[in-house]
Amino acid sequence: MARRPLVMGNWKLNGSKAFTKELIEGLKAELHDVTGCDVAIAPPVMYLGTAEAALSGCGCSCGGKSVIQLGAQNVDINVKGAFTGDISTEMLKDFGAKYIIIGHSERRTYHKESDEFVAKKFGALKEAGLVPVLCIGESEAENEAGKTEEVCARQIDAVINALGVEAFNGAVIAYEPIWAIGTGKSATPAQAQAVHAFIRGHIAAKSQAVAEQVIIQYGGSVNDANAAELFTQPDIDGALVGGASLKAPAFAVIVKAAAAAKN
């Protein structure tokens, strides 16, 4: 089946009110006529309100609804209560966020989030009607030890074991080899495709139908120079973009490359 690609920008810990407005205005100008690719941005949660306002009334033929959708970089498993500093699914929905990143290696590493905890976040998002963007991927040491597939399978199985394979219906997986995140080193298109094919095959062992529709993004130093070649690969359904998402022209090139390759 034809899968509609998704290119998502993860701003990480970057931005300000002024930056958010300026970048979104640039993105709207660059992307207003793009079709055939879903686009989302995940600014810091403090700027979701600013982003929501900036995205409304885009002034093009879409009837006032921007082609760019909102996302977020994290969520808690609790809906409300005494959980200082946390953000709930309902709060994210209140600002129109749809695509929510979970399991990013920076969260797994710096905040000690386990596979099982990430799976709980996945379940909370599904229950709330939001789209989980599940990040998986191996470290450089694991890659060199030939454990890439083992690590990816373990991180996917945490969700399957907790929620069943059907939980991946309408969900997104982002394969981000940790050794490629923010390093300037990217997996080659062939390397990335091999892992993406493994991921899809691993899910297909439980359900072919689920595997065929799940969006599998590549992430890890994706930029305007390497995106087009990555998107020629059959199992790469878009990208989760870090640094390059902070510049409207570069991010637009990536989005347009996905739209061109997959349509």
UniProtKB/Swiss-Prot annotation:
GO-annotated biological processes: gluconeogenesis; glyceraldehyde-3-phosphate biosynthetic process; glycerol catabolic process; glycolytic process
Catalytic reaction annotation: D-glyceraldehyde 3-phosphate = dihydroxyacetone phosphate
Keyword Isomerase: yes
GO molecular function: triose-phosphate isomerase activity
Class in the EC hierarchy, top level: isomerase
UniProt keyword Cytoplasm, yes or no: yes
Main localisation: cytoplasm
Family: Belongs to the triosephosphate isomerase family.
Xref: PANTHER family: TRIOSEPHOSPHATE ISOMERASE
Protein's recorded name: Triosephosphate isomerase
Organism: Haemophilus influenzae (strain ATCC 51907 / DSM 11121 / KW20 / Rd)
Lineage: Bacteria, Pseudomonadati, Pseudomonadota, Gammaproteobacteria, Pasteurellales
